[in-house]
Protein backbone atom coordinates (compact mmCIF):
# COMPACT_ATOMS: atom_id res chain seq x y z
CA UNK A 1 0.00 0.00 0.00
CA UNK A 2 1.02 3.59 -0.61
CA UNK A 3 0.86 4.40 3.11
CA UNK A 4 2.77 1.43 4.55
CA UNK A 5 5.02 2.62 7.36
CA UNK A 6 8.72 1.85 7.13
CA UNK A 7 11.22 2.06 10.02
CA UNK A 8 11.70 5.81 9.62
CA UNK A 9 7.95 6.47 9.75
CA UNK A 10 7.55 4.15 12.75
CA UNK A 11 10.35 5.97 14.62
CA UNK A 12 8.79 9.34 13.81
CA UNK A 13 5.39 8.05 14.98
CA UNK A 14 6.92 6.93 18.29
CA UNK A 15 8.61 10.32 18.75
CA UNK A 16 5.42 12.24 17.92
CA UNK A 17 3.28 10.04 20.19
CA UNK A 18 5.67 10.68 23.06
CA UNK A 19 5.16 14.46 22.96
CA UNK A 20 1.48 14.84 22.07
CA UNK A 21 -1.75 13.52 23.56
CA UNK A 22 -3.69 11.04 21.40
CA UNK A 23 -6.45 12.65 19.35
CA UNK A 24 -6.49 16.19 17.97
CA UNK A 25 -3.24 17.28 19.68
CA UNK A 26 -1.37 14.36 18.08
CA UNK A 27 -3.00 14.93 14.68
CA UNK A 28 -2.02 18.62 14.84
CA UNK A 29 1.55 17.67 15.72
CA UNK A 30 1.74 15.16 12.83
CA UNK A 31 0.29 17.73 10.42
CA UNK A 32 2.97 20.27 11.39
CA UNK A 33 5.74 17.66 11.33
CA UNK A 34 4.89 16.58 7.78
CA UNK A 35 4.79 20.20 6.61
CA UNK A 36 8.21 20.87 8.14
CA UNK A 37 9.72 17.64 6.81
CA UNK A 38 8.70 18.05 3.17
CA UNK A 39 9.32 20.54 0.35
CA UNK A 40 6.62 21.08 -2.26
CA UNK A 41 8.05 20.11 -5.66
CA UNK A 42 6.34 19.03 -8.84
CA UNK A 43 7.51 16.11 -10.97
CA UNK A 44 9.70 14.41 -8.37
CA UNK A 45 7.08 11.81 -7.45
CA UNK A 46 4.25 9.98 -9.20
CA UNK A 47 0.91 8.41 -8.37
CA UNK A 48 2.62 5.20 -7.23
CA UNK A 49 5.13 6.89 -4.91
CA UNK A 50 4.82 5.53 -1.39
CA UNK A 51 4.77 7.59 1.78
CA UNK A 52 8.13 6.11 2.76
CA UNK A 53 9.70 7.06 -0.58
CA UNK A 54 8.29 10.60 -0.47
CA UNK A 55 9.55 11.12 3.07
CA UNK A 56 12.98 9.76 2.13
CA UNK A 57 13.05 12.22 -0.78
CA UNK A 58 11.73 14.99 1.46
CA UNK A 59 9.68 16.38 -1.41
CA UNK A 60 6.52 15.90 -3.37
CA UNK A 61 3.06 17.26 -4.00
CA UNK A 62 -0.13 17.28 -1.93
CA UNK A 63 -0.82 13.57 -2.42
CA UNK A 64 2.64 12.77 -1.04
CA UNK A 65 2.13 15.02 1.98
CA UNK A 66 -1.22 13.32 2.58
CA UNK A 67 0.30 9.84 2.25
CA UNK A 68 3.06 10.64 4.75
CA UNK A 69 0.52 12.03 7.22
CA UNK A 70 -1.71 8.98 6.76
CA UNK A 71 1.18 6.60 7.41
CA UNK A 72 2.08 8.48 10.59
CA UNK A 73 -1.51 8.74 11.82
CA UNK A 74 -2.10 5.05 11.30
CA UNK A 75 1.19 4.15 13.00
CA UNK A 76 0.01 6.25 15.97
CA UNK A 77 -3.39 4.56 16.05
CA UNK A 78 -5.33 7.52 14.64
CA UNK A 79 -8.04 6.37 12.20
CA UNK A 80 -7.61 8.42 9.05
CA UNK A 81 -8.50 8.61 5.38
CA UNK A 82 -7.27 10.25 2.18
CA UNK A 83 -9.42 13.02 0.72
CA UNK A 84 -9.34 14.16 -2.89
CA UNK A 85 -11.07 17.35 -3.90
CA UNK A 86 -10.57 21.01 -4.58
CA UNK A 87 -9.21 23.89 -2.56
CA UNK A 88 -10.98 26.99 -3.78
CA UNK A 89 -8.51 29.46 -5.24
CA UNK A 90 -6.16 26.74 -6.46
CA UNK A 91 -6.16 25.62 -10.06
CA UNK A 92 -6.05 21.85 -9.80
CA UNK A 93 -7.19 19.07 -7.56
CA UNK A 94 -5.93 18.89 -4.00
CA UNK A 95 -5.43 16.16 -1.40
CA UNK A 96 -5.66 16.29 2.37
CA UNK A 97 -6.35 13.98 5.32
CA UNK A 98 -9.31 13.40 7.59
CA UNK A 99 -8.71 11.99 11.05
CA UNK A 100 -11.80 10.31 12.49
CA UNK A 101 -12.16 10.76 16.24
CA UNK A 102 -14.89 10.16 18.82
CA UNK A 103 -17.05 13.17 19.71
CA UNK A 104 -16.42 12.71 23.46
CA UNK A 105 -20.09 13.36 24.25
CA UNK A 106 -20.78 9.75 25.17
CA UNK A 107 -22.92 9.16 22.09
CA UNK A 108 -20.47 6.82 20.41
CA UNK A 109 -20.47 9.09 17.37
CA UNK A 110 -17.34 10.16 15.54
CA UNK A 111 -16.39 13.19 13.50
CA UNK A 112 -13.89 13.62 10.66
CA UNK A 113 -11.39 16.43 11.27
CA UNK A 114 -9.70 17.72 8.11
CA UNK A 115 -5.95 18.40 8.08
CA UNK A 116 -3.95 19.82 5.19
CA UNK A 117 -0.28 18.94 5.71
CA UNK A 118 0.66 20.68 2.46
CA UNK A 119 -0.27 24.01 4.07
CA UNK A 120 0.15 23.07 7.76
CA UNK A 121 -3.48 23.94 8.36
CA UNK A 122 -6.82 22.50 9.31
CA UNK A 123 -9.34 22.04 6.55
CA UNK A 124 -12.43 24.20 6.54
CA UNK A 125 -14.27 26.54 4.26
CA UNK A 126 -12.92 26.33 0.76
CA UNK A 127 -12.17 22.61 0.89
CA UNK A 128 -14.52 20.74 -1.43
CA UNK A 129 -14.47 16.96 -0.98
CA UNK A 130 -14.91 14.88 -4.12
CA UNK A 131 -13.91 11.43 -2.83
CA UNK A 132 -12.38 9.67 0.18
CA UNK A 133 -10.43 6.43 0.46
CA UNK A 134 -7.48 4.70 2.05
CA UNK A 135 -5.01 6.46 -0.27
CA UNK A 136 -4.75 8.00 -3.75
CA UNK A 137 -5.31 4.68 -5.50
CA UNK A 138 -8.87 4.56 -4.10
CA UNK A 139 -9.85 8.02 -5.32
CA UNK A 140 -7.92 8.77 -8.51
CA UNK A 141 -9.84 11.70 -10.06
CA UNK A 142 -9.67 10.37 -13.59
CA UNK A 143 -9.03 7.10 -15.28
CA UNK A 144 -9.13 5.86 -18.82
CA UNK A 145 -7.32 6.54 -22.04
CA UNK A 146 -7.29 9.41 -24.50
CA UNK A 147 -5.82 8.78 -27.95
CA UNK A 148 -5.46 11.55 -30.51
CA UNK A 149 -3.39 12.81 -33.38
CA UNK A 150 -0.13 14.59 -32.75
CA UNK A 151 -1.91 17.92 -32.40
CA UNK A 152 -4.73 16.63 -30.20
CA UNK A 153 -5.43 18.26 -26.88
CA UNK A 154 -7.54 17.25 -23.90
CA UNK A 155 -8.88 20.01 -21.67
CA UNK A 156 -11.08 20.00 -18.62
CA UNK A 157 -12.82 22.66 -16.61
CA UNK A 158 -14.39 22.70 -13.19
CA UNK A 159 -16.97 24.92 -11.63
CA UNK A 160 -17.87 24.89 -7.97
CA UNK A 161 -20.90 26.61 -6.52
CA UNK A 162 -21.57 26.94 -2.82
CA UNK A 163 -25.08 26.30 -1.60
CA UNK A 164 -26.60 26.67 1.82
CA UNK A 165 -26.80 23.45 3.78
CA UNK A 166 -29.38 23.23 6.53
Question: Where does each model-flagged region fall?
Answer:
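Hydrophobic/aromatic-rich core segments of domains that either
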Residues: 32, 64-151
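Secondary-structure boundary elements
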Residues: 1-60, 136, 148-166
Amino acid sequence: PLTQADDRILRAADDLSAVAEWGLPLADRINDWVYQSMTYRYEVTGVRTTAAAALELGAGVCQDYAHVMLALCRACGLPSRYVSGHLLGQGGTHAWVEVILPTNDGSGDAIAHAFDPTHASRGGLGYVTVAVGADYSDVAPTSGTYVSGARGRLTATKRVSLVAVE
